[in-house]
């Protein structure tokens, strides 16, 4: 895709299997993205440079996935005015609770929108990015509306199936 609007950054390549769900969702909606592995702790200069130059490169939203001491979203948010969506990656001794707290507990003035730990996180991060982009793109907004209608139909079908038993 030529029109890259979303930057997806993960703290480690071990996050890639989870992050692929965000990519699949963006692909479904035809939203262009780029992916990078950048560590907030091991390559902080790269993280800051990536974030500082994101807007001039045409990005509109950044998604940051990290586990453990998950400071990636905060570091990226500190260096840009673009919306940053954090995906806390489950794992380690605290099974993602540390990543959740590190992602969601940001100081005033440095917001990171945070989605769920686990498999819903990447999908919801991509959907939130699509909603943000949809505020300035009527076609994308309509496709998101259609997606929501499909979700309603699936629930109605499940209800009909269970209710008829």
Annotated model-derived regions:
Residues 4, 10-17, 21, 97-165:
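C-terminal binding/interaction regions
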Residues 35-56:
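N-terminal beta-loop-helix "entrance" segment that forms/cooperates
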Residues 50-92:
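Glycine-rich phosphate-binding loop
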Residues 21-28, 52, 79-81, 130-131:
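Short, solvent-exposed amphipathic alpha-helical segments in soluble enzyme
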Residues 2-5, 29-32, 57-60, 80-84, ...:
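Short coil/turn connectors at secondary-structure junctions
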Residues 10, 37, 66, 87-90, ...:
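Short beta->alpha connector loops at strand-helix junctions that form conserved
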């Amino acid at each position: 895709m030529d029109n890259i609007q979303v930057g997806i950054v993960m703290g480690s390549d071990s996050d890639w299997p989870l992050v692929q769900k965000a990519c699949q969702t963006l692909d479904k909606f035809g939203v262009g993205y780029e992916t990078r592995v950048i560590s907030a702790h091991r390559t902080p200069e790269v993280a800051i440079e990536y974030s500082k130059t994101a807007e001039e490169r045409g990005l509109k939203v950044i998604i940051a996935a990290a586990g453990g001491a998950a400071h990636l979203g905060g570091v990226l948010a500190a260096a840009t005015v673009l919306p940053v969506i954090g995906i806390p990656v489950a794992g380690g001794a605290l099974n993602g609770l540390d990543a959740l707290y590190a992602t969601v507990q940001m100081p005033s003035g440095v917001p990171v929108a945070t989605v769920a730990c686990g498999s819903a996180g990447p999908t919801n991060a991509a959907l939130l990015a699509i909603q943000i982009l949809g505020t300035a793109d009527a076609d994308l907004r309509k496709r998101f509306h259609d997606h929501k209608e499909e979700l309603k139909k699936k629930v109605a079908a499940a209800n009909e199936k269970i209710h008829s038993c």
